[in-house]
């Protein structure tokens, strides 16, 4: 009889991913560089790089990290200076002059998975919240990113480091299945809520929200270079006392693709 699966906290996951991870080098942005995100019907949001460690988001300061999976694609990630236990990830397409803003929020207590009960409506299957905003990087009209089903049916393998390897199966618009093949979560698997956004040709933003251990993943998947880049956010321990918001990257391999007949 096998032992019961034990899901680990995100802090332990970060420790496992850290040694020799397949991370991109950080992107250097000059002090004073600014990005204005124009959203129809809303006030523009302002991001200003103050120095190599600090940015300003609508006038409030926060530490930041940026990478460039492609020369014209910036991934800027930081903890939300206006909310506790929250982050903002900005994916900027400098060629198309548009962006996707991902606002993530962790619960402040242990989550309870939602389920159907007689006479009641369904509650959320995960306590991790996410909100997407599609914006222009200038005041001129133009194309915006959008949700996509292009990844659905793919079964991919991701190698995050010499010791950490995962498999993903993108099931439908709302869910994907994952399992850890090697690493600190080896033998663990689940089906979790997810979202897909097309950023550019063969480049996708994949966001997932785990229900057992409160976790938010925000990852770019480049099917031309066959690699990924992004971050994972959760709590360091089970006491919900400190956040772990750490970068991740992987090499990618498409194992197969399933297309169901309608």
Curated annotation (Swiss-Prot):
Propeptide boundaries: 1-13
Short name of one Pfam family: MoaF_C
InterPro entries registered for this protein in UniProt: Calycin (IPR012674), MoaF_C (IPR035348), MoaF_N (IPR024724)
Protein name as it appears in the record: Protein MoaF
Protein's organism: Klebsiella aerogenes
């Amino acid at each position: 009889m096998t032992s019961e699966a034990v899901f680990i906290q995100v802090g332990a996951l970060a420790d496992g991913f850290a040694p020799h991870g397949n991370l991109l080098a950080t992107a250097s942005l000059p002090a004073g560089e600014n990005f204005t995100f124009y959203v129809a019907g809303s006030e523009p949001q302002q991001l200003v790089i103050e120095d190599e460690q600090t940015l300003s988001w609508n006038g409030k300061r926060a530490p930041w990290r940026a990478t460039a999976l492609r020369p014209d694609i910036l991934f800027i990630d930081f903890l939300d200076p206006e909310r506790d236990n929250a982050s903002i990830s900005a994916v900027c397409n400098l060629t198309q002059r548009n962006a996707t803003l991902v606002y993530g929020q962790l619960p402040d207590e242990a989550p309870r998975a939602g389920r159907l009960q007689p006479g009641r409506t369904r509650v959320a299957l995960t306590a991790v919240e996410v909100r997407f905003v599609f914006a222009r990087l200038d005041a001129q009209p133009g194309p915006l990113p959008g949700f996509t089903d292009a990844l659905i049916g793919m079964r991919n393998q991701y190698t995050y480091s010499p010791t950490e390897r995962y498999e993903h199966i993108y099931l439908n618009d709302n869910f994907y299945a994952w399992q850890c093949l090697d690493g600190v979560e080896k033998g663990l698997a689940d089906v979790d809520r997810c979202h897909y956004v097309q950023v550019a040709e063969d480049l996708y933003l994949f966001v997932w929200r785990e229900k057992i251990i409160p976790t938010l993943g925000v990852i770019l998947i480049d099917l031309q270079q066959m690699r990924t880049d992004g971050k994972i956010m959760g709590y360091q321990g089970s006491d919900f006392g400190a956040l772990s918001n750490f970068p991740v990257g992987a090499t990618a391999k498409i194992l197969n693709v399933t297309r169901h007949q309608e």
